[in-house]
Amino acid sequence: MKFFTKLLAVIAVYILFNNSNVNAQGCVAIRGNGSFQTMDHPMLDTTIASDKSWYLTASYRYFKSFRHFSGTAEQKQRQVLGNEVINHQSTIDLGITRNFDQFWSATVGLPYLINTRSSLYEHGGKERHSSYSHGIGDMRIVVNRWLFDSHKTHKGNIQVGLGMKLPTGNFNAQSTFYNVTPAVRPVDQSIQLGDGGTGIIAEVNGFLNFTSKFSGYTNLYYMANPRNVNGTRTYRETLRATLANEANSSVPDQFLARLGANYTFQGHNSALTVSGGMRLEGIPVYDLIGKSDGFRRPGYVLSAEPSLSYSLRKINFFANVPIAVKRDRTQSKTDKENSIATGTRVIGDAAFADYSINFGVSFKL
């Protein structure tokens, strides 16, 4: 029981690390900004709930998106015809957490992204070429507080967090495109390194101990991006006249919800935790604050999320593999407007991954 009582502060260590380019996996562009993977795994040395300490976390995330969906319907013909878009995205996430006492903590994190996007339609439609982007992403700074004193509360706890996402990532990353003649221009929104907006992060994390080994967890996350568009040209207006409203990149909100359970095998100086749950993440059609003009691919992914964590003294290893069970590319604002104008339902498509691979390590300094 004591082990789980102290578990609550360790959750704060992991809240902002192990992406997420969280994340909806593919052209629904949730970047690796870290906040989309909240920790549900314990660390053996869990005194961070009650003392001043520092934690360093490093994580890695990879996925390949290639399955196209329009709404919830998969466009299987894209792979048969060989005109699907294929994204390979890797994110290395580094961050540091300062625990002030059993209530308060603050985390600063910065991802590094490596992206490749292979397509036909962006390169004239006859030959497949690739575009690239790599560099630092958007920084986040979040302050968290547990609502109840961990010294007195043993059954469970709730943590609330508030912070900012800073536009440190390049939102106008460029690569060479091959049409009539090669030209350098901005890469697709899904592999841009940042979105150009200053985001407002709000999150709620909680856990409940059912027994000394079995517990449940939940995480709710929303990032509001008040900025409307960021000025990065998409060139979508060159595809069809009906996409004229999408010539500029939108700065969209992002959301995440998780619910699951943990079971811990406790050793003398170590602990192995097995976790399982569901994960919902995506981009809304309309932002919570401000306008929602420009180009975005709204949608969501519902995933089954198995996880493992191994704790040994002052170090914790973790890994999870969210597996998509439902993918939905919802109607964008432009789709809705064109549906009204034409009298027929218009909806774009987006490429999604089958799963993502996430793993990392945390150290108490």
Language model: regions and residue ranges:
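Bacterial Sec-dependent N-terminal signal peptides
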Residues: 1-27
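Short loop/turn motifs that connect adjacent beta-strands in outer-membrane beta-barrel proteins
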Residues: 25-28, 44-53, 65-67, 103, ...
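Surface-exposed strand-loop-strand hairpins of Gram-negative outer-membrane beta-barrel proteins
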Residues: 28-30, 62-91, 190
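Residues on the lipid-exposed face of transmembrane beta-strands in outer-membrane beta-barrel proteins
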Residues: 45-46, 58-60, 94-98, 108, ...
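Residues that define the transmembrane beta-barrel architecture of outer-membrane proteins
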Residues: 52, 88-92, 133-139, 156, ...
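Transmembrane beta-strands of outer-membrane beta-barrel pores
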Residues: 60-66, 110-116, 147, 164-170, ...
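Outer membrane beta-barrel transmembrane domains
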Residues: 69-78, 228-365
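Outer-membrane pore/translocation modules
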Residues: 115-250
